[in-house]
Amino acid sequence: MRECLSIHIGQAGVQIGDACWELYCLEHGIQPDGFILDHQHDNLENPKVEHMNASLDTFFHETRAGKHVPRTLFMDLEPTVIDGIRVGRYHSLFHPEQLVNGKEDAANTYARGRYSVGSEVIELVLERIRKLAEQCSGLQGFLIYRSFGGGTGSGFTSLLMERLSVEYCKKIKLEFSVYPSPRISTAVVEPYNAILTTHSTIEYSDCAFMVDNEALYDICQHKLGIERPSYASINRLIAQVSSSITASLRFEGPLNVDLIEFQTNLVPYPRIHFPITALAPIISAEKAYQEQLSVSDVTASCFEVSNQLVKCDPRLGKYMACCLLYRGDVVPKDVNEAIAAMKSRTSVQFVDWCPTGFKVGINYQPPAVVPGGDLARVQRAVCMLSNTTAIVEAWARLDHKFDLMYAKKAFLHWYITEGMELGEFVEAREDLAALEKDYEEVGLSF
């Protein structure tokens, strides 16, 4: 089998993980206790169930008793959020050893997450990952969920990625990263954390799918009609993206996409590995359309700014690569027509050194939705991952915020007292300036 290990780090990573595994269980017909719903009865009633769970082993380990345990690890430096999972609806789905927490918080600082507090639990976390890896017959790689702005998400992840690169050097590492929003901030020192972690993980991460809270809030408010979106609503949106990206690993389909194929098709140069994500259709459960949207409709929606999960305007940049992952009632002929229509649009510009540009995945398993959730059930959906030079706008925004604080040496003492040096800040900022330049250069014509 080609198994994948999911690692959820910090408050954002853990809460996204909770939403992801809830959705995966619904998609595979797994109950909160880990057992598949009346397996034999289901097979007689619905022969698709057996086919549906043919590739289940990539994400779930089946015990002798027939229980399906997720191949995952949840980790936070303080216990509150992990305790929420220990007593939550899916508490019996996970083995207690898969839920790891420290005793004190990273206090929103990269330095505590990486050095002082993080270093105390890193060996335990690696030991638990080793145990999970030993249950795999052919480990394909790691999916790492975290935020750039938090202390644990930024600091501990950079320490872990470094160690994983040593112990599992050939295994692919894909990230789902919550990027600091332009206007909504959960911590004053987010720009420091984000730039330090980007610098320290850029060589260890193979591909990082970007989402940001502001774009997600806007989708919840404008598309789903939620006046005051909760983190639960936002995390379920991210879970839909994660599910679409991993669907071809978990279900059979006519055009499957392997983990390494994302890297091969989306990353033209090692450092340019930050694709933006978009999802369509996003329809509220209350306003569920009577007519279903066509393949062309959902494909066109993905190229609209309002369907993107990151605040940046792709019309201001050029696409280097684009991966379209379709689910449900979709046939290749419709996809080809939809792509041809998109290529003829002047607003969708590709760099001249990448003329084809589109990678396609098709999976017949329609998207599932959480009962009582915000999203409507649809027959077909598409998730778009696109590597575009427009993301440089997001990096430039972040760099500017970093510069404003660093010019006054504001909040630096929290990092220095944990053993960091000013040189690390300077080095990280220079690396990000180089990253901005890299993006500008790849967008240039010959």
From Swiss-Prot:
UniProt key word Mitochondrion: no
Post-translational modification: Some glutamate residues at the C-terminus are polyglycylated, resulting in polyglycine chains on the gamma-carboxyl group. Glycylation is mainly limited to tubulin incorporated into axonemes (cilia and flagella) whereas glutamylation is prevalent in neuronal cells, centrioles, axonemes, and the mitotic spindle. Both modifications can coexist on the same protein on adjacent residues, and lowering polyglycylation levels increases polyglutamylation, and reciprocally. Cilia and flagella glycylation is required for their stability and maintenance. Flagella glycylation controls sperm motility. Some glutamate residues at the C-terminus are polyglutamylated, resulting in polyglutamate chains on the gamma-carboxyl group. Polyglutamylation plays a key role in microtubule severing by spastin (SPAST). SPAST preferentially recognizes and acts on microtubules decorated with short polyglutamate tails: severing activity by SPAST increases as the number of glutamates per tubulin rises from one to eight, but decreases beyond this glutamylation threshold. Glutamylation is also involved in cilia motility.
InterPro entries per the UniProt record, alphabetical: Alpha_tubulin (IPR002452), Tub_FtsZ_C (IPR008280), Tubulin (IPR000217), Tubulin/FtsZ-like_C (IPR037103), Tubulin/FtsZ_2-layer-sand-dom (IPR018316), Tubulin/FtsZ_GTPase_sf (IPR036525), Tubulin_C (IPR023123), Tubulin_CS (IPR017975)
Keywords from the UniProt entry: Cytoplasm, Cytoskeleton, GTP-binding, Hydrolase, Magnesium, Metal-binding, Microtubule, Nucleotide-binding
Cited SMART domains: Tubulin, Tubulin_C
SUPFAM superfamilies listed in its UniProt record: Tubulin C-terminal domain-like, Tubulin nucleotide-binding domain-like
EC top class, as a word: hydrolase
Coiled-coil regions listed in the entry: none
Catalysis: reaction(s): GTP + H2O = GDP + phosphate + H(+)
Binding site for Mg(2+): 78
Subcellular location per the Swiss-Prot or TrEMBL entry: Cytoplasm, Cytoskeleton
A single GO BP: microtubule-based process
Molecular function (Gene Ontology), one example: metal ion binding
Binding residues for GTP: 11, 78, 147, 151-152, 186, 213, 235
Motif extent (MREC motif): 1-4
Residues the record marks as active site: 261
GO CC, one annotated term: microtubule
Its EC number(s): 3.6.5.-
Protein's job: Tubulin is the major constituent of microtubules, a cylinder consisting of laterally associated linear protofilaments composed of alpha- and beta-tubulin heterodimers. Microtubules grow by the addition of GTP-tubulin dimers to the microtubule end, where a stabilizing cap forms. Below the cap, tubulin dimers are in GDP-bound state, owing to GTPase activity of alpha-tubulin.
Family: Belongs to the tubulin family.
Comment text on domains: The MREC motif may be critical for tubulin autoregulation.
PANTHER family to which the protein is assigned, alphabetical: TUBULIN (PTHR11588)
Subunit record text: Dimer of alpha and beta chains. A typical microtubule is a hollow water-filled tube with an outer diameter of 25 nm and an inner diameter of 15 nM. Alpha-beta heterodimers associate head-to-tail to form protofilaments running lengthwise along the microtubule wall with the beta-tubulin subunit facing the microtubule plus end conferring a structural polarity. Microtubules usually have 13 protofilaments but different protofilament numbers can be found in some organisms and specialized cells.
Annotated protein name in UniProt: Tubulin alpha chain-like 3
Gene: Tubal3
